[in-house]
Every structure is written in C-alpha cells, then in structure tokens.
Amino acid sequence: MASGAARYRLSCSLPGHELDVRGLVCCLYPPGAFVSVSRDRTTRLWAPDSPNRGFTEMHCMSGHSNFVSCVCIIPSSDIYPHGLIATGGNDHNICIFSLDSPMPLYILKGHKDTVCSLSSGKFGTLLSGSWDTTAKVWLNDKCMMTLQGHTAAVWAVKILPEQGLMLTGSADKTIKLWKAGRCERTFSGHEDCVRGLAILSETEFLSCANDASIRRWQITGECLGVYYGHTNYIYSISVFPNCRDFVTTAEDRSLRIWKHGECAQTIRLPAQSIWCCCVLDNGDIVVGASDGIIRVFTEADERTASAEEIKAFERELSQATIDSKTGDLGDINAEQLPGREHLNEPGTREGQTRLIRDGERVEAYQWSVSDGRWIKIGDVVGSSGANQQTSGKVLYEGKEFDYVFSIDVNEGGPSYKLPYNVSDDPWLVAYNFLQKNDLNPMFLDQVAKFIIDNTKGQTLGLGNTSFSDPFTGGGRYVPGTSGPSNTVQTADPFTGAGRYMPGSAGMDTTMAGVDPFTGNSAYRSAASKTVNIYFPKKEALTFDQANPTQILGKLKELNGSAPEEKKLTEDDLVLLEKILSLICGNASEKPTAQQLQVLWKAINWPEDIVFPALDILRLSIKHPSVNENFCNEKEGDQFSSHLINLLNPKGKPANQLLALRTFCNCFVSQAGQKLMMSQRESLMSHAIELKSGSNKNIHIALATLTLNYSVCFHKDHNIEGKAQCLSVISTILEVVQDLEATFRLLVALGTLISDDSNAIQLAKSLGVDSQIKKYASVSEPAKVSECCRLILNLL
C-alpha cells in the first residue's frame, strides 16, 4: 500500500464483557450491528450509534452453562425476518436466539465436547465443529448428519451454499471438503492446527493456522499462495466486502490487514490474545481480545476516535508488557540494543518494529506511516544476554529451558524429566510429556496444573483465577499430534455370453405395464404429464427375474470346487432345488428348516464360487418364512454382517451385485424391513463405496436400495434417515451414467421430499436441485425427464 493511502485507526473501544471475547459476527439487524460472545457466558448485540461512530449494547443473551466459544447468524426467514443468532459453547451445546428474548428459542444437543465453530447456509442449515472431532449439519432443530473423518478437534467450519459444499479445518492440520455428507477432498499443507477459514468466492477460500501462516486454496485442491507476517498462532480470519482483501488476528497481540496479498498494516493491541475479528459492511474492523474489550478500527475520518481517545489507547498500549520469550519480537540481546536516539530515524515500512534500550528497560516501538512517528507498543520483559549464564537457562538433552522438572507419577517408581519454557503452552507441554513417556492421559490436568503452579508470574497468557491456554481459553483441550472395479458386460456380467446370468434380465414387478419401473427404455406414461405417477413410491422394489435351471446348473458345477467340508451332498442339492421350485412356482408350501440350513451352508462358500447360492438367497428372501428365518432379531445381525462383507470394493462384482439385490428384496416383509432399518448406517456406508465402479447393474441395485429406504422413511418421517438417503442420492448422481439407475434415484429423491418441508430444505442446501436440472432435458427414456421436472417443481 502506498504511504499516502488511508490507514486504519481506532474508532471506539467497547467494554462490557467480563472475560475474553471469543467470537464476533456481523448482524442482519439492525444494519451495521454485530454480535459478540465471551468466556463470561454471554452473547451481546451491539447496534451502531448514529450518525457516525460508536456502538451501544442493545441486547444481552444468556443460555450457556459454560464459556461461549463461537457465533454465527442464521439468515432471515418468513418466521424470523431478522434472522437468528447461533452460539456454541464449552457446555457442548448450540443455543439459538431471536432478537426479542434474552433466553434461547431452543438448544441443539448432540456434540460430545466443546462446540468451537459455526457457519450457516441456506434454508436454515447450520454447520458446527467441535472438539469431539466431528462436524454436524443441522436443519432447524434437528441434526441431519454427522461429518466424521478428522482425528482431532474441528476448529473451523464454513459452508459454500451455492455448490452445497462444506469445509472443515482441524487440529489434525488438515482441511476437508464435504459434499452431501461425504469427504470429497483433503487439503494438506499447514504444519499446525487449522484455526480459521474464510470464503473468497465459489472456488477459493483462505485458511489460517497455529503455524502462523495463511493459505489461499482452490476448492479443487491447489494451494495458490502462502502468506506470512504473524509471529504466533493465528486465531481468526475475515474477508472484506470486496472478497479479495482480508484481516487476521493472532496470539502476537496484533491485528493485521492484508491487501493485494501483502500485509498492508499491523495494529498492536494491549492484550496478549486477539481471538477474533469481523469486517462490517462499511469496511470497519471489529476485534475481540483476551482483555474482554471489543475494539473497532476504521479508515473513515468521520468514524475515527478523538485525539484524546487515541492518546489514551496509545498510552494503554505503551504500558503493556511484552515477554521476550514469546518470540514475537525476534531474538533479543539487551546489551546490543541502541538507545533512544535510534527513534530519530524514520521507519521503512508500516508496522515495522524497533527495540531500544532506555537504562535497564527495553521498549518496543512500531512505525506508523500515516503519523510519521514511532508509537510505543510496550515494555519488553525477560530480555537478557544470549548466553546460559545471563539467561538463567537449564540445559537438557542439548537444549536450553527455563525449567526442567522431575515428575514422580507413581510412588516408588521412576521420575520423569519435564523441560519447560515460559513461552510454551502448559497444556501442550503436559500432553506431549504424557505421550512421550507413555503415561495415562488422565494425568493431563494434574501435570498442567503442576506446571502452572510452579511457574506462576511467568507463564504467558494465564490469569489468576483460571487456567487458560491460547488454543481455547478453557484449559481443557488436548490438541492432536501430527497427525477396483471391473467393467461388466450387460449380456453376462459374470460367466460369459449364453451362460448363467444372475438377475441379468433386470426388474420385474407384478404390475407390468403400469409401474414405470417395469417398462424398458421405451416406456411412455399414458397419463397427463401434470399427473405424478412416479412418487411417492409406496412399496419396496424387488429383483425377481430368475432362471432356476441355469442357477442350479452353475451351483452343481461349482460344488466340485468347494472345500471338502463345505461341499453339498446330493441330498443337499435336492433340497436347494426344492427351495427354488417352491419360490419360483409361487407354491403355498413353506421351505423347511433343513432346506434353510443347507442354503446358509451354501452362501458361506468361498467368495470365488458363492454367487449362485447368493442368487438362490436373493429369490428366497422374498418368501415370508425365509425372510423371518434370516432377518429375525436373533439371526439378523449375523446374516446382514455376512452380506455386508461381500460389499467390499475389492471383492467380486457378482457377489456385490447379488448382495445388494438380496438387501433390496429383504424389504418385502416386516422382519426384513426392521433389520434393514437397524442396519441402515452400516449398510449404506458400505454400499456407497461401490459407486465408483462402472458396473451399471451395481448402480441400479444401489439406486434401488436407496429407493427402498426412501419408501420406509416416507412412512415414518425419520429426518436423520432421510438426510443419509439424500446424501447417498447426491453422491451417486455425481458418478452414475445409466439412466435406469438415475431414474430410480430421482424416484427416491421425490419420495423423500414429498410432503416434508424439512427434507425439501435439506435437499436444497445440498445443492440437489442444481445437480438434477440436466435430467429435465433427457428425451429417452421420457420417464427420467418427467420425474425430474416434477421434483424441480417441489424444489
């Protein structure tokens, strides 16, 4: 920035909070307002004074039983035209406030540890990040899905609403991109905990971390730039209205303003931890710090503080103390520093820091280009010469430390050495000490308290009444340490043309000529296009096609390859033949227990030869007595686990296909339906792994499984189950090419959102509407475009 350009100066200081200000966000109403949250357990709304500068506390809200860590604004709706305020706390809860009540409208419970980050999207969706290593997606007062994948606390979350994408940043040093509940990409590059995220555009975002760096990313994965300037943990980042420039705050007591990719201005504050910041619509910057004061900085002359207020701020800043051991000012050797005459020389850049010696004191000054002078930013404490004798350091394993403690964990046991510098975080040191010596993590509080008690008066950032670390202010967080598919031809996916083809003829139903699922690709609806004949689907869809002669022939052929202990006898083969005859002939007779025992024996054949037995199971499971036998509460878990194991992406495509079709057919009876619902999360998470292959039959089976779950959820309105199905639908639509699979996914989608406004909003938030628009122009088969247009009318 040129020296003549406008500089940010203090506009006002806002006392009110009694402890650290941990979060800030611009508010929708009144215009120009913002919301703050604090460790004092309160949330406060600040409205601008008119016409120029200053803010007044308009509303104070309470609801958390512990520190409040983060805040965001939920956009306006018909019911709440001024939007809602969401806050997350150390009590594991999220409180939702309106502007007309000091108490929460409702509280979201579900996280198992501190909620430390929030972001809102369209249609009432909310994304939360927690120390419990998860992020959760909420719609109104319900949890829609949980994002699992990080190995440490999720410190930062952001929603990119236009694409239905979500970002999470973690103490495991990574950032993850999520779509429809699934991790699509992991960004690696930061060398320490990721603390903040900010959106630049639909394709780019920024991140900041404890490694004192800021990174600019494309959502495709490329890191476009790394920015350095801070000398300690960076806690927050906020973007200007131009969506290009940004501001950051950090543990180095500074607010930094970045323009055109460079640090254009550094503003020091009289507090150690500058926890949070936000940029108002008029370009003013609001910051919150560990001293409980909110400060606003502006470029506008009409909103700049009076000369007396600026002098008072500079006086407060000059009286602050800076510990030399934080490293914020570089290596300091007091004996080699110049005297006050050095301040007669002008600085070379905005924010340049200069240290001078005044008798026994070391003072820190910062150059202000706009004022053309050096401004004192504090007295440096703890500065000394550079040798061990003058510094009072203790050598341990070749390194210098302020302290080396002997820790006795067990009486009579060995003692452990614990090296510590006063610039270190006591909780992190305690954590690393326990990890290094393989000690029980339950000792964390005890060891950290030992460090704090024995370094009182010298440990950075600690008050007299609480144990606070620069990660959280709460003193309890333990940060993590560094941390094939084969193409299958339609004619015969398994054994060759003209041979046994399990289920290759596709779908049959008892209502041929009426149900659009039963027609081939030339199907046309006889009804008017204004009449919806596609969804909601009321009954499960099954795979019925069979050729018993070919199935038995293949079974007998492969029986010779089975291990001796698993070979079927001639009597066994006769029993299986009777099952097939009974099932395919629609006889009223029930399969016997002996027949079902032989079938169980057959489906436990080795994976290379088991597929004909699975095909018999696929057909048999539709029979009520067979369904009850395999899907009852006693046998169901073992049965489903066996089939789920066959869904291994590295397994045989024939087994994958027939296992999926068997699961689809389980839905026809009450016992099977109950089992499928109880196994939903495990089954769907394994089944979705098969989406990446090119086998269209597997895609159709996967779509049918999702459709059958949708039928169940349409009946009982399980919003969590609907969320998982919507996620699966969105994920499969990204890769599927077969139009029959696409059609079934569309019917599943329509069934899920029919008569359910919450499901409609969730589908919108996932970007499903934009995802399916391309199918509205499909000409063959017509059922695809007709179904798609009906869904778009709902969305």
UniProtKB/Swiss-Prot annotation:
Domain PUL: 533-794
Superkingdom field: Eukaryota
Cell location: Nucleus; Cytoplasm; Synapse
Keyword list, A-Z: Acetylation, Cytoplasm, Developmental protein, Neurogenesis, Nucleus, Phosphoprotein, Repeat, Synapse, WD repeat
Molecular function via GO: phospholipase A2 activator activity; ubiquitin binding
Gene Ontology CC entries for this record: cytoplasm; extracellular exosome; nucleus; synapse
UniProt repeat feature ARM, residue ranges: 546-588, 589-620, 621-669, 670-715, 716-755, 756-795
Positions of post-translational Phosphoserine modification: 50
Positions of the PFU domain: 366-465
Annotated WD repeat ranges: 17-56, 63-107, 110-148, 149-188, 190-227, 229-268, 270-307
Domain commentary: The PUL domain is composed of 6 armadillo-like repeats and mediates the interaction with VCP C-terminus. The PFU domain mediates interaction with ubiquitin.
Described purpose of this protein according to its UniProt entry: Plays a role in protein ubiquitination, sorting and degradation through its association with VCP. Involved in ubiquitin-mediated membrane proteins trafficking to late endosomes in an ESCRT-dependent manner, and hence plays a role in synaptic vesicle recycling. May play a role in macroautophagy, regulating for instance the clearance of damaged lysosomes. Plays a role in cerebellar Purkinje cell development.
Family: Belongs to the WD repeat PLAP family.
PANTHER family associated with the record: PHOSPHOLIPASE A-2-ACTIVATING PROTEIN (PTHR19849:SF0)
Name this protein carries in UniProt: Phospholipase A-2-activating protein
Organism of provenance: Rattus norvegicus
Taxonomic lineage: Eukaryota, Metazoa, Chordata, Craniata, Vertebrata
